[in-house]
Swiss-Prot record:
Possible metal-dependent hydrolase. It is an enzyme of class 3 (hydrolase). It is found in: Cytoplasm. It comes from the Bacteria. Binds 1 zinc ion per subunit. Belongs to the metal hydrolase YfiT family. This is Putative metal-dependent hydrolase BLi00869/BLi00870/BL03027. HAMAP family: YfiT_hydrol. The lineage of its organism: Bacteria, Bacillati, Bacillota, Bacilli, Bacillales. GO terms for cellular component: cytoplasm. It comes from Bacillus licheniformis (strain ATCC 14580 / DSM 13 / JCM 2505 / CCUG 7422 / NBRC 12200 / NCIMB 9375 / NCTC 10341 / NRRL NRS-1264 / Gibson 46). Homodimer.
């Protein structure tokens, strides 16, 4: 496994989740924007625009990618709750990260968005029943089913994965 690419390992989709795990994931979801803000704090423009690995995104793009991805994840969750196992739409995250907004805007814009989004998402999850967490959506192309408890675990991992990218990058570059 490439430590630069997967600093906390790859995602392992859980096959079940109990109430304790759900509560932990919801708490982790609430905490993630704060941890991301801390990881990216006090970086100057040059540092924000430095890729965390060869062929990887700049720190700025990582922050904006998390907002883009998690908005999609939140909407997918709402679709699964209101439609019968919907086929969701994917997005080209590489192309999105290459758009001008992801390459140039202040990361604080996406950090503020993530603060609010994660609070909404956590409140939604706190309102769900066990049966709700079993609802799912389908990825086009692969046909993979993602239950809502699995999606919650995925987006918590995704947050931690990119926070670890930024923290490890800062350490390698001596920016701590």
């Amino acid at each position: 496994m490439d430590q630069l690419k997967y600093p906390i390992g790859t995602f392992s989709k859980p096959l079940e989740a109990d109430e304790r795990e759900l509560e932990k994931w919801i708490g982790d979801l609430k905490q993630a924007p704060h941890l991301l803000r801390s990881a990216a704090a006090e970086l100057n423009e040059e540092q924000l625009d430095t890729p965390y690995r060869t062929g990887g995104w700049a720190v700025r793009q990582v922050v904006h990618h998390l907002a883009d991805s998690h908005m999609n994840g939140y909407i997918r969750s709402k679709l699964a709750l209101t439609e019968e196992t919907p086929l969701i739409r994917t997005f080209d995250e590489q192309n999105w990260a290459g758009l001008t907004d992801a390459r140039t805007l202040d990361p604080d814009l996406s950090l503020a968005l993530l603060d609010t989004l994660h609070l909404r998402w956590a409140a939604l999850x706190e309102s769900l029943t066990e049966a709700d967490f079993e609802k799912a959506y389908i990825y086009p192309g692969t046909g993979e089913e993602m239950k809502l408890y699995q999606a919650l675990a995925l987006y918590v991992w995704h947050s931690q994965h990119h926070i670890a990218h930024i923290k490890a990058h800062r350490k390698r570059m001596g920016w701590n």
